[in-house]
Amino acid sequence: MADITAADIRKLRELTGAGMSDVKKALVDNDGDVEKAKSWLREKGKAQVAKRAARSAANGLVESYLHRTDPQLPPTLGVLVELRCETDFVAKTDDFKQLARDLAQHIAAADPLYVTADQIPNEVLEAERKIYEAAAREEGKPEQAITKIVEGKVNGYVKSSVLLDQPWVKDGKVTIRALLDQAGASLGEKIEVGRFSRFNIRQA
């Protein structure tokens, strides 16, 4: 068996963010090869996410957020978001509550329209396709390129409109889907957004 050094353990933890026990096991099972251990941990993480996805998230909380453009003025925007987990114990943790606050603030800033892509009505997607196709023809794009251009535009619309596909406003390298997966791995439960509402507040 290969010697496992403290430097190897530290490097793998920095690369993956995995716990100490998982990192040690990954290195032992892969003869100290950091790259193989990294792949092993990645596959284990995918398996854990898939396992959690099959479970029911029946607990959680509803977080509210009021946005003010000026601390001295009344709020102009409100958000309600339902964040679900499997147990009441996790719902009461500070990490879960902070995640709900982060999501509410993200929704206020990013203005998503749907939680998941399958919630987008087909007629909405078709309307977007027609708009992009008409624009491409008006710009004189080659006929053979229009389909690819339109699909790229539609995919962009989905990514900007769907909460789970949006980049997190606090870290553009992480999507909201990845943020929830990371939280689920950390808390050991399935974490999901049930629904949300974003609304403007009119002053009398």
From Swiss-Prot:
What is the designated name of this protein? Elongation factor Ts
Q: Where is this region: Involved in Mg(2+) ion dislocation from EF-Tu?
A: 87-90
Cite the PROSITE patterns for this sequence: EF_TS_1
One example GO MF annotation: translation elongation factor activity
Q: Which cysteines are joined by disulfide bonds?
A: none
InterPro entries in the cross-refs: EF-Ts_dimer_sf (IPR036402), Transl_elong_EFTs/EF1B (IPR001816), Transl_elong_EFTs/EF1B_dimer (IPR014039), Transl_elong_Ts_CS (IPR018101), UBA-like_sf (IPR009060)
Chain's gene name: tsf
Q: Which HAMAP family match?
A: EF_Ts
Task: Report the source organism.
Answer: Frankia alni (strain DSM 45986 / CECT 9034 / ACN14a)
Q: Where in the cell is it found?
A: Cytoplasm
Which UniProt keywords are listed? Cytoplasm, Elongation factor, Protein biosynthesis
Q: Main role?
A: Associates with the EF-Tu.GDP complex and induces the exchange of GDP to GTP. It remains bound to the aminoacyl-tRNA.EF-Tu.GTP complex up to the GTP hydrolysis stage on the ribosome.
Give the family per the record.
Answer: Belongs to the EF-Ts family.
Q: Cellular component terms, GO, for this chain's entry?
A: cytoplasm
User: Does the keyword section mention Membrane?
Assistant: no
The record's annotation in Pfam families points to:
EF_TS
